[in-house]
Amino acid sequence: MGICMGAYWAGQEYFDILEGADAVQYITRPGTDTRRPHPKAIDIVWQGQTEKMFFYDGCAIVGDATKFRTVATYANGDAMAVIQKRIGLIGCHPESEESWYQQPSWMRTHYHDGRHHSLLLNFANQLMAQ
């Protein structure tokens, strides 16, 4: 399982372990809702539920969508969290702690109160069941 930079490691620039897919910088993608890599809470859809999740220049998983199962997407529809066989990748930070949202102060209202930790645990359980 790779989160943020850990997900990038699965891509063609690094270990190249994905079948028919790549991990690419989300801020460079068509239709992205952000062009800046700085920490922020961005809109994602995780299994049908819209969330604001901590983002810090994370990756999108692109390629043949029949080769992986998409668990979450970014606002532009790119895959943000995927499972491919025994590989699980997440571009944002569901593991984020409350302290991550303290600076800058405008992010304080976006802390998830642990909801994202539950999403991450469910994701890990799905991955281990593969």
Regions found by a protein language model. Give the residues of each.
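A broadly tuned preference for mixed-charge, low-complexity surface segments
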Residues: 2-7, 11, 49-58, 121-130
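Catalytic beta-strand/loop cores that center a nucleophilic Ser/Cys/Thr
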Residues: 35-101
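Generic detector of leucine side chains in alpha-helical contexts
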Residues: 15-18, 27, 80, 89, ...
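Extracellular ligand-binding/catalytic regions of CAZymes and related secreted enzymes
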Residues: 86, 94-130
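Short, low-complexity, polar/charged sequence segments that are solvent-exposed and flexible
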Residues: 20-22, 36-37, 88-89, 106-111
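Residue-identity detector for glutamine
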Residues: 12, 25, 47-49, 84, ...
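A glycine-rich, often tryptophan-bearing local segment used as a flexible ligand/cofactor-contacting loop or short
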Residues: 1-46
